[in-house]
Amino acid sequence: MPGTYAPVPNVYHLLDHLTFRSSVVIPNSNFVGRIWSDYWALQDNIVIRVSPEGAKDADYCHNSNISPILSPLKTITEYGTLHPTIDKDASERGYPSARMASSFFKLASCQARQVKIDPTRFLEFLLVTASSPRVPSGVDSDQPNPWLPETSPALQAIWQIMQRYKLNGNYYAPALVVNTGAVWWIPPPGRTNCVTVQFLITDLINLAVNAFATRLAPELEMCAVRVYLAAASTPNYAHALLDLKSIFPNLSLHSMYREGEFGGKCPRIEWTEPRSSYRFKWIGVTQLYEGLRPLTPSRDSKALLKMRDSGLEDVAKVIITMRRDHPRHTSDSVRFVRGVLSLISGMYLVRPPTMSVLREYSQTPQIEEPIPPDWWTGAVGNLSYFNDKAKGPLAHLYSVWLEAARQVVMDPSTHDPLTQAIYKTQFVTPRGGSSAALKQALVESKVELPDFSGTGVKRSSKIYQTAQLAHFSFQTLIPTIMGQVTLGIRNQVQRRARSIMPMSNPQQTVSVPHTLVANYINKHMNRSTTSGSAVQDKVIPLLLYASTPPRTVINVDIKACDASITYAAFLAPICGAMHQGFDLGDPSLPFMNVPSSTQYDRRNPAAPYNRPVSGLQTMTQHLARLYQAGFSYKVDDPFSSGNSFVFPTTTFPSGSTATSTEHTANNGAMADFFLREYVPQHAKSSTLKFIVKDMNIQNNYVCQGDDGMLIIPDLGTKRISPEDLAELMELLEKYGRGFGWVYDIDSSDSAEYLKLYALFGARIPNISRHPPVGKEYASPETGEIWPSLVNIAMGSFYNGVTDCLEWRDWLKFSWAFACFASRGSFHPKTGPRVDAQYPVWSFIYMGLPPILLPGQTPFLTSVYMPAGDQGIFAILHQWRDYLTARATSDYPPLKRRHPVWHLADVPSLLSDLGVYRGYWAAQVSRRPEPSPDDADPASVEAMSAALSTYLLKDPVLRDRVVRGTNAWRRLTDTHPGRLPSRVPSLLDVPTRWIKAGRDADKPRPSAVAMMMKDIQRAASSSRKDFSRLLELYLHVHVHLGPPVPLAVDPEVPHVAGADILNDDHWYKVTSLGPIAQSTKKYFDATLFVGKTVSGLDVEAVDATLLRMSILGAEPEEYHAFLAGIGMSDAEAHRIASAISLADAQIVQLARTVNLAVPSSWMSLDFDTLIRSHSYPRQPGISDSSTLVRERASWINSVLRLLCATVAMSRVGPVCQATVSSVDGGVNQIVGCLRAWMRDV
């Protein structure tokens, strides 16, 4: 397995052969280690990180010599881990000095571990990739990359640093990264091994890879090297990097076009109605002129001030001088901005969990205008309502939540058993959730939990917890609501590590009303977007729209948002408003099996009384009690032995399912009052009042969680004045202070939202957030199973495509990474070693385009090639003539005519080229599958029964599912072979949960060995065929015609890096234009069924419905299937009548045969490509094999997507694609696809 204790091949010797041309000076202070014990202290028997220099929040790994606390390894004596005596003294005897030494070792090792694999491997990949010039592709626009290893300041800095780590002619890396963390070099007496050097080398390797992949100028690369070296000479590298991270955006993105002759072009973008659809239109070009120059001053002085303290003033001046070469908005200027932003360190920052908790969860906001006691009515149980005296922003917040709660409780769908099942299953996942604390709370109540350990399901998972609690009534579980929550950690890039609170199931259950009402607010009252980790999930066109003049954008962020949502200012009014809103409902109704209850109502002090409240209100009562008391955070710090304590906090729990949607609802509601009431009442400027008069949160404020973007509209062609802009920002800051929010407000004539950036309508990929080397490892000791490295390599490649890295160079680098990742071995404790090797074609199947295939010119396949059968179809399609000719000349003809290759023995040729072996090996699961023999059948059955009880506790839902399943069985038995043999059902969900829970647990060695053998077996298989679907796709012949008309002006920058130097990205962007709609909204609109329970996939449900339609299902068959997934008769009838093959979207129909839009297309206008530039047959005289019968018109969508796949998989401009012919005729394909659908 990669990561066993073995020295990395001495890649540093390769640097000895380079003649460097830059002059990097490494300060001696980088190698002077501070005494580690000065940085730790004991406070109330808790080991804490301290800063003898008095630096604020400097909790990260300090620059100290680690060698005094090491003990040599038996296998490699030059390297060591924590001395066993120190480890024992810390863990068993609790000696303070040993606990501190152990904490230092674990913190340093965990920081070193935040990489995909040992960083020297990436140095190897880079040097191998850059060792020879790239094969020229013969295309005029293929410009050689000017980056050379000899001119790289980052590589020279690495070489100079490593001279300190050279002994007897051999180099020793400061640390070797292994699965469980790091092992550290033990230097000879008189030398030190300062931990920061390892982190610095990682950052320098990361920088060198980025510089190579972006054609970064050596001058800019040197700027980053200087900053990293300056940070490494401080006592605290990560803290210094955090302090300096703003300098690069301030000197580039936030300061562009402030001087010189401004000009250039940017897109004109319109946000079409209804705005909730997030559809945008590119309606031309704006010629930029002096009146549209950025309003806000440059941030140079701010950056210079910060850099002066670190002796980096000259670095800032280099960037400023280079920036002055770009006074106009062009593809070169946005490439420059992307280059400067890429200089920010991409390190995942680690800090001790204890310090995260003490810092993050002890904050209490300053509320300047607290709620007066006379605003409240008398108590109703644990909460109170606002009375008529309430006014101002919090009264508005109350009214928003009150109205939303009324709408929710009056909506019949809220009370549908399936809706309730969807909400109660949303937190049933393989992730953990305060299980130990929940168990403790029940033990104190003398409740014994059932044991399902024989199932092999991960014990800490929510799935296991759900099964344990399934048979208990809500009443029994009430004590657990106030139970402790346990510690979770997330390490982040360019942000401090944050601790998270995973809540237990009963706590999540009572949070559901909060989620329900917040979702309503965000859907109907706010203009909120979804947040996803992938760029494609976010609303890219919104950002581009906001950044184009004459609009002005203010980027808003709520500082310490979790801590700012206090009970006093927010949660008390919200709980009161929800409870009061739910008064409109039936007080006897339970909700999610929480029964109604009686609460003491003291609103009228003269006549208090007991009154019944509904299940929803009972949940709200418990939620109010929980929020009011705050949370007890149970901290067992894995870094510091003996750091086990309970920390009370009033901070909003980050692990609640309500967190994100709740923050978004409040963010929008407070912005609503600000625009409608606060600014008109408090603004001094009459023009500002005039501008704000027409602004509202539906059109001008978009938010997600604590992030917001205020879009100020234009006044005709004029923009808001700098004075009005400054006043508006000042008012917002003052407004927030009233209720305890600190708004971090920024306006720099660029748009920033959810960590995406745009400047004058051009997306600026934030490369440093996708570091080639870095990866988050949240657990201090975590092992990776080998094939996961293959997924990591592919993920890294896709990030480079999204970020528009130089595509040929990035492809070459990605293949170097893939070659390393392709081989793995496993050493069981008993028995022989197991090896596995992926063939080249496995990576092509996974989506990595080949650089050169026999008979073709280099770099012919685009990085926009989809993965899977689609990609293989596109490659074989453009390779078809060569394959046929070579098979005809080199192999005897086939005895039986092949439906695609006729008499040419192409299957034997493909087999000899290794295509089939790679194809099938890539489809073997890369996760070890737990063996059924490892589980106790009785235990599995008991757990399945418990999970079924939880899911189907509602008798109405249970009746629907049983009725639907029986009806489906009866109908399919009556007409066997007419409909799909297997369809999703709620009865399958418990089995799926158990499988997910078993997969989440650490795999047994036997399962790992079996997976490796399966991969190797597939990689050496003698099969000579593809999947049924791909064999059918290959019947289709696609003709590429002329290039599609340009969608956008090629001179307008749309994505930084997608320019003529990076030709394929440029051709794709100019051919199609940027994505014009929210991808989430687009794909949501392609679904008949919007939501389903956790454990079922809405896309699978949707594909099943369409397959049934294609196969001619009757209404009662739809009803039976939909009842089987829990739907009411009315909802089943509505959906069944909505299923129309004529109205279904193209991507929806293509999904029925496993075709999809790959993520790489989602930043482009793929819908127009599929709809308007892909043709299922030639207009006019078509080949008779392409003529489709009317009732099989759904096949046109499949053919369109195959055409689009061929067009996008070829480099260069996107061409119109047409199906020219179909071997055997399209109607034969239709019949075969129908047969496949019945078997799937």
From Swiss-Prot:
Superkingdom per UniProt: Viruses
Name used for this protein in its record: RNA-directed RNA polymerase VP2
A family per Pfam: RdRP_5
Lineage per the UniProt record: Viruses, Riboviria, Orthornavirae, Duplornaviricota, Resentoviricetes
Disulphide bonds in the chain: none
Keyword Oxidoreductase attached: no
Annotated RdRp catalytic domain residues: 516-764
Enzyme Commission designation: 2.7.7.48
